């Protein structure tokens, strides 16, 4: 069916539509033409394995001295290669944490080492107490001014503050103190260190997407006087090997996208397969989850099309029938749907049918749950469309009831579960029960998005958003509403951090997915720009992630 055939009925009826005029894709070529050979990946793996044994020996040798051990573990984490030695690292950190009272009593560590120890333990779930930083305060309860002479120690303290939980006032004070002085110190430092400081001030390590942070740290580490050549080579080999895997996955995704032909059939929607894959790789970073990344990216692309249909093209009556059809989700959609919606409906139907047929991975019951998430998402999208159609601005709480669903966290978590064989109904039940870490991730997904509402969305008029509802509820300005919502997000990070601390009943794979979803939401909408829609903002990140290898 030609494009004109799908959309002509609406044109003939002269239906008034809001057209968002999304920017075209930034990618003028298909990644399907850039598929690497399997032999290339195997060659990288062999070379990596040779160096891996040397790095493992270094890790085991570092146990003799705590400062050396914690610095080496930190390097492994920040260079993106700690997953190779996960069991060894957990064993070492567990031993340190158990012995921590004695260690702190017998040693007077520097600001740099103490903050590094604090951050590394906390990022692995060990809740080291924050009162260890009282030693850096003067008799007036203020942080000592002499600390500003230790630039690396100050930067390490700054990074440590982002792992705080509620009630840790000293870390809130430390954040304000370090941020103020680091902004000045960046001007006085060497270009090498200044760039590292500015990257941290823009997006701290704990909040940054892992692959972006890893790339930045490899570049920084290469310029360090204390750089270990073997460790640097290992990190670069690992980065380049994963890059080949990511490029292969993006090539397969490009073929799928070409086959379903959505941009020709539905030209009003965003063509963002590369950006969708960047999200998948930013959230699901471990190499063994290739299938999960592809599942996630495909679901994200289809949900983007649905979102554009609800927000930017469909009429209210069309959306009403489309939502009802999705609630039934049978083979034949209702005849009341226009042709373009029937096409979209059939794409969704066929996609879920193909997933459900994959019995070898035991997906049938998981696909059923994901289908229910799709129905819930459609109801949420329609509720927002109904408010707009009726000229109703809901309260902030009413909006968030549906807005947390339209954050898409639940839907994308279910897509992730579909791609991981070891995850089953137990994890879906966890998601359905709405634990704190999931609620927090949804809060971030919704509020970050609404802070970065595009100008074309603003032109649509009183389309509800969290910002507008909050302004109306509290009779405050746009600036004040954003300030208050950013405070909610700061508190949300503390909630998230608390959920990461041991003991926890949540499997690590789920906490990692949740926090990486938050990191990608933060990165995508930081600065008030929707980098997913405005693809220029993500282009360099994607190139570095998938195209340009690091020189070894």
From Swiss-Prot:
Positions of Mg(2+) 1 binding: 307, 311
Q: How is the cofactor bound?
A: Binds 3 Mg(2+) ions per subunit.
Q: What is its EC number?
A: 4.2.3.-
Indicate which residues form the motif DDXXD motif: 307-311
Enumerate the residues binding Mg(2+) 2: 307, 311
Q: Which UniProt keywords apply?
A: Lyase, Magnesium, Metal-binding
Residue stretches spanning the membrane: none
Q: Which GO terms describe its biological process?
A: diterpenoid biosynthetic process; olefin biosynthetic process
- Identify the Pfam families for this entry: Terpene_synth (PF01397), Terpene_synth_C (PF03936)
Q: Which SUPFAM superfamilies match?
A: Terpenoid cyclases/Protein prenyltransferases, Terpenoid synthases
Domain of life of the source: Eukaryota
What cofactors are annotated for this protein?
Mg(2+)
Give any GO molecular function from the UniProt entry.
sesquiterpene synthase activity
Binding sites annotated in the UniProt record for Mg(2+) 3: 457
Q: What is known of its domains?
A: The Asp-Asp-Xaa-Xaa-Asp/Glu (DDXXD/E) motif is important for the catalytic activity, presumably through binding to Mg(2+).
Q: Which family does it belong to?
A: Belongs to the terpene synthase family.
| Role summary | Catalyzes the cyclization of farnesyl diphosphate to multiple sesquiterpenes, such as olefins and sesquiterpene alcohols.
- The identity of this protein, by name, is Terpene synthase 5
Q: Which organism is it from?
A: Ricinus communis
């Amino acid at each position: 069916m030609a494009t004109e055939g799908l959309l002509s009925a609406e044109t003939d009826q002269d239906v008034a539509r809001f057209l968002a005029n999304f920017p075209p894709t930034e990618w003028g070529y298909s990644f399907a033409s850039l598929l690497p050979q399997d032999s290339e990946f195997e060659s990288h793996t062999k070379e990596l394995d040779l160096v891996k044994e040397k790095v493992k020996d270094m890790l085991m040798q570092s146990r003799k001295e705590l400062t050396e051990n914690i610095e080496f573990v930190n390097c492994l984490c920040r260079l993106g290669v700690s997953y190779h030695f996960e069991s060894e690292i957990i064993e070492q950190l567990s031993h340190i944490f158990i012995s921590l009272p004695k260690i702190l009593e017998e040693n007077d560590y520097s600001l740099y080492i103490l903050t590094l120890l604090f951050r590394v333990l906390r990022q692995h779930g060990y809740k080291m107490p924050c009162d260890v930083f009282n030693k850096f305060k003067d008799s007036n309860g203020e942080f000592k001014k002499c600390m500003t002479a230790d630039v690396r120690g100050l930067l390490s303290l700054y990074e440590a503050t982002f792992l705080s939980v509620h009630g840790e006032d000293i870390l809130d004070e430390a954040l304000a103190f370090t941020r103020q002085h680091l902004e000045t110190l960046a001007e006085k430092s060497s270009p090498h260190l200044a760039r590292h400081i500015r990257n941290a001030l823009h997006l701290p390590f704990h909040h940054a997407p892992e692959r972006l942070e890893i790339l930045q740290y490899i570049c920084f580490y290469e310029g360090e006087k204390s750089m270990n050549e073997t460790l640097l080579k290992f990190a670069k080999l690992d980065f380049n090997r994963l890059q080949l895997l990511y490029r292969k996955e993006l090539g397969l995704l490009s073929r799928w996208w070409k086959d379903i032909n959505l941009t020709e059939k539905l030209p009003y929607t965003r063509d963002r397969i590369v950006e969708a894959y960047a999200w998948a790789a930013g959230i699901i970073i471990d190499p063994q989850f290739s299938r999960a990344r592809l599942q996630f990216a495909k679901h994200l692309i289809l949900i983007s099309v649905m979102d554009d249909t609800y927000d930017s093209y469909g009429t209210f009556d069309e959306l009403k029938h489309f939502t009802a059809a999705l609630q039934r989700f049978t083979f034949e959609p209702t005849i009341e749907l226009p042709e373009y919606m029937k096409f979209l409906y059939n794409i969704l139907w066929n996609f879920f049918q193909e997933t459900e047929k994959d019995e070898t991975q035991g997906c049938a019951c998981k696909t059923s749950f994901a289908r229910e998430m799709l129905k819930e998402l459609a109801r949420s999208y329609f509720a927002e469309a109904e408010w707009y159609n009726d000229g109703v601005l809901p309260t902030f709480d009413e909006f968030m009831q549906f807005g947390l669903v339209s954050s898409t966290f639940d839907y994308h978590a279910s897509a992730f579960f579909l791609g991981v064989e070891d995850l089953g109904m137990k994890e879906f039940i966890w998601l359905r029960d709405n634990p704190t870490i999931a609620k927090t991730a949804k809060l971030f997904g919704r509020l970050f998005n609404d802070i970065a509402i595009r100008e074309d969305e603003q032109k649509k008029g009183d389309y509800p958003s969290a910002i507008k509802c909050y302004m109306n509820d509290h009779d405050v300005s746009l600036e004040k509403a954003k300030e208050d919502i950013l405070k909610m997000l700061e508190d949300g990070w503390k909630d998230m951090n608390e959920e990461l601390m041991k003991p926890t009943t949540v499997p690590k794979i789920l906490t990692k997915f949740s926090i990486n979803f938050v990191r990608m939401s933060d990165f995508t909408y930081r600065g008030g720009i929707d980098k997913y829609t405005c693809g220029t903002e993500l282009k360099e990140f994607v190139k570095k992630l998938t195209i340009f290898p690091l020189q070894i």
